[in-house]
Amino acid sequence: MVYSYTEKKRIRKDFGKRDQVLDTPYLLSIQLDSFKQFIEADPEGEYGLEAAFRSVFPITSYSGSAELQYVSYRLGEPVFDVKECQIRGVTYSAPLRVKLRMVLYDREAAAGTVKDIKEQEVYMGEIPLMTENGTFVINGTERVIVSQLHRSPGVFFDHDKGKTHSSGKVLYNARVIPYRGSWLDFEFDAKDNLFVRIDRRRKLPASIILRALDFSSEQILATFFETIGFEVKDGKLMMDLVPERLRGETATFDIVANGAVVVETGRRVTARHIRQLEKDSVTQIEVPVEYVVGKVAAKDYAHPQTGEMVVTANQALSLEAVANLSQAGFKHFEVLFTNELDHGAYMSETLRIDSSSSRLEALVEIYRMMRPGEPPTREAAEQLFENLFFSSERYDLSTVGRMKFNRRLAREDETGVGTLTKDDIVDVMKRLIDIRNGNDEVDDIDHLGNRRIRSVGEMAENQFRVGLVRVERAVKERLSLGDLDTLMPQDLINAKPISAAVKEFFGSSQLSQFMDQNNPLSEVTHKRRISALGPGGLTRERAGFEVRDVHPTHYGRLCPIETPEGPNIGLINSLSVYSRTNEYGFLETPYRKVIDGVITDEVDYLSAIEEGKYVIAQANAATTEDGRLKDELIPCRHKGESTFMNADQIQYMDVSPQQIVSVAAALIPFLEHDDANRALMGSNMQRQAVPTLRADKPLVGTGMERAVAVDSGVTVVAKRGGMIDYVDASRIVIKVNEDELLPGEAGIDIYSLTKYTRSNQNTCINQRPCVMLGEPVMAGDVLADGPSTDLGELALGQNLRVAFMPWNGYNFEDSILVNERVVQEDRLTTIHIQELACISRDTKLGPEEITADIPNVGEAALSKLDESGIVYVGAEVKGGDILVGKVTPKGETQLTPEEKLLRAIFGEKASDVKDSSLRVPNGVYGTVVDVQVFTRDGVEKDKRAKEIEEMQLKEAKKDLTEEFKILEDGIFGRSRNLLLAAGYSEDRLNKLDRSKWFELAIEDEAKQIELEQIAEQHVELKAEFDKKFENKRRKIIQGDDLAPGVLKIVKVYLAVKRRIQPGDKMAGRHGNKGVISKICPVEDMPHDEYGRPVDIVLNPLGVPSRMNIGQILEVHLGLAAKGIGEKIDRMVKEQRELHEMRDFLQQVYDLGEKDTQQVNVAELSDDDVRTLVGNLRKGLPVATPVFDGAKEREIKALLKLADLPESGQIALFDGRTGNAFERKVTVGYMYMLKLNHLVDDKMHARSTGSYSLVTQQPLGGKAQFGGQRFGEMEVWALEAYGAAYTLQEMLTVKSDDVNGRTKMYKNIVDGDHRMEPGMPESFNVLLKEIRSLGINIELDEE
């Protein structure tokens, strides 16, 4: 196997049994591809901005004399890059410029004669851009647009499960859902009449919509019913016979064929009878006249002479009506064919309750329903109906909707118009009646073939279109009004509504979320999240159990494990590892093709609908060496059911065992041994892990770690291969390989690293180089580790030595006992960075001022501020310290007339200011790591701001100069090589000034041209760098664009180092979470016979009832992995020969049943082996892929190889007494995470503080600096103890006795510890509430 440079440094032993057919796809592609489609020009105009423009333009004036046409658009360059936007708190966006053409037509001349054409580029607002990691920077914070799972447009058939009507009858309904426009519903009521609703308004008989489409009663009946013909022959009534229609009927008269009775009266007609009738080829049978009574006429029958209606269509026939028909000369007439079983008379019944009889009446009825209270006119009614479903401006099924619509109605063609047609409406009604008749099935709305994904690009496009439509109205009016000859397109377009719509979507939509930036995994998962909530989706309260449940079609598309616990369970899902969306927005998952029982390497992506047609085997189906399916019967899935089939019936096979789970679940080793509920908690808690100070790769992983770390974008990845030319803490320079160079390029790549920056969750983002000078790298290699990554692998926690045993009750109820050494070694120490901002505004009474001159503040409090009143970088501060001194002008105090007079004469303003400085919040401590000052344009900068500016300029200059030097060296290096090859000596070149080299001549003309090209490049490079520096300088010096009324903003960043302490929450990866109860001295911890203490002690009772056995297997395998590392460490210390090391490594990597990894240590160079051995001394990292992991036998073999007991249990000794524990204890290594639920953030205590306005009781919660509620049950407890005085104190002075508490405070200050309880304010509130009911209560003071 070929390993990249970074992978070679530490090769993970893989226990996977199956070869990977398909590499893990790029994890963020759902975001990036969707936005790319939105932003990139699309010549077809089907997607993105292009589609939005084409759908709104051209805009024609009301009179038709002018038209505004769309030509093209282009996006400009963003003003600031991503990092600058984050620092300045602005949106990372690019200006959108649209080329429009205004065409004026000559009114006098013939239609379509053009008078004037004007073209112009118009600015249409800013479009936020996506960063390369799939996020948006909005107002300085990183946000993610979560994809939405919504009901696909199309037609759906469903029933109410018998809940609507008291009889429990199942009522069927059909619903046509467009992408935009009015919903159209058809539904049956309990009497089997068919109704229609538009936009969920009141229902009308369904025939009304057909009448509005210009159907007559006859046409309606002809469309929905088959007919039976009757003929009067020789005084007998004959009926046309279709034998099949008689099946299941009971004969009410003898059915005679060719003189013989086939069915007697009262007998049921069976299949045998029908065969007999068909055999006799009977076309007509005689029926008694009574048989026709009650049948329904299929047509209008008018008297040939008088024109008078004899029978109208849909009229039930009586004997009299039949006689009338006969008299009028109608020897042959037709009635509707209906029966109870599968030809219901629904439309016929519906026509009876329909009051309208003409198209106009139907239109008026629809108008009244849509616009109650407005008087209908013919034009208005027609216009409304036309606009509802037949106007492309108001109604659009979209390509997806049309495809789903046509597929559901079993049409050949899947394309068509976006609006509805007559046929569409009729076909939907026909299909619904078919379902009611039992000839078709209803749809499953939770099937993933009926739910589609709406991603960023599509949602942004919709918002943009909304903005454009708002502009369209204004443009239409302006085109009709002003003097068009002098106007340009720019004067017609106002970009505000467009930018407002886009800004609103990115800033405050429910699906635009503050990115979860705890660690790389939480970022990746957030971007791959699929939500059913949001605009146009479900609401938590209304979502039932079915929508939330796992559906068979989730297989390989949505993860069945990862979803939040709580009210959102099942509504927020995560994409499976290999899942992707197709062109229509439906989720697809890959499968390997199987042909005649032979597995091929051909991979097809199938959507949920396509999958139903095939037989699909699982990835773990047994196979022979040559890739055939082994067993006779193979477990497989077909049409959503699990079943067994023969090998030759199998058509597809899963790509990988981890295909069904999401990224987070795929990171849990031995997931297959965990209960699903615990696996859910495990995948959710991994996202809350805080990056530790020193990342530590998991000893037991799953092989997914590298993919997550690289795809998340927190690491620095080489774009091209080459040699490391220079490396320090903040920059890596690569000299690019010759074969990867573009012609005429310096051949130097420079990567800048992010240092100690704050994340959205206040954790610390810091990148560290993991390459050395002179090392060769390939494209895609990891050059620097980010937060929670170690050598390019995800590292969320630490490998700790665990013992499963009780220890003096300190691990009761999932508590965790931790060794003090873990704290001393900073294993679980994390750095948190907090941002505190001080804003100076312009108030009515004058501007606020940032200054060190603060009234009534002692010297000590100002000791950490500089002369501008801003704290020094590096100062250590604690709660209550001043960070930024600020004073605010105070309001006028009540002045005496004399003072007023003096003020009026001398005009001096009140010199009163009050202290409004930024202080460190209570309970926060830390070190100031950075200060930033933003000053409004036109406001003078203070000394500190100028210092910061100078420093930034210096940094920028230094950076650019170094960068320039590196690139220049590259250029001179190439020209030197050319000149040396041309015969110039080293000495001569060294004596000359480098810039003179370009003046030397070379005989070979091609080389001379190349030298001239390089010289030209050098000049260009210098010019480019001067321009870059000027740009940088301008950006640093210019004032900042601050909100209105803000003069200055000072941001102070505090770094807090948090060690692990009792009360912090920790967890493993299997949902095994707990709180630290005690940090125990090293000497008291249980230790083994060599005196090595364990790091943490967990309760063994936490395992059996929770059924997450994966953690035990992880501990055993962790012990073996660590044991191998220790064995290698001993070999190094004994200075064994390199070939012995190679042999041992080969033995380790070859261990296992069928190992797909095949590491050949012989291929590695001696240096590679030394590096590898050095990295393995702390433990051999192993991978046990999900559902394809290490077997018990393999774990035992590895333990044996490491010279450890195969049971995984060892004898432990009590640290305090030195005695051995009674029985052996399971000891090993588990990967433990420290979660972002730290006791420091939760600890809180109040003495006095703010009170609620009405009840005067203290507020609750840490944010309000509130008190602890002494509730009803606590009162009972004190009552039970008879502690009357304590209780009185709780209910009065400590709560809402206003006078009492003030007095008490005063007494304490005076050193007098007495209290006098008074009347609690809540009692007064009660009195007032009773009085508001009209009952007067007064207290008699005796």
Swiss-Prot record:
Q: Which GO terms describe its molecular function?
A: DNA binding; DNA-directed RNA polymerase activity; ribonucleoside binding
Has UniProt tagged this entry with the keyword NADP? Answer: no
- PROSITE patterns listed in its UniProt record: RNA_POL_BETA
What is this protein identified as?
Answer: DNA-directed RNA polymerase subunit beta
Recorded source organism is Aeromonas hydrophila subsp. hydrophila (strain ATCC 7966 / DSM 30187 / BCRC 13018 / CCUG 14551 / JCM 1027 / KCTC 2358 / NCIMB 9240 / NCTC 8049)
Record function comment? DNA-dependent RNA polymerase catalyzes the transcription of DNA into RNA using the four ribonucleoside triphosphates as substrates.
GO terms in the biological process aspect are:
DNA-templated transcription
Q: Which HAMAP family does the entry link to?
A: RNApol_bact_RpoB
Signal peptide positions are none
Instruction: Give its E.C. classification number.
Output: 2.7.7.6
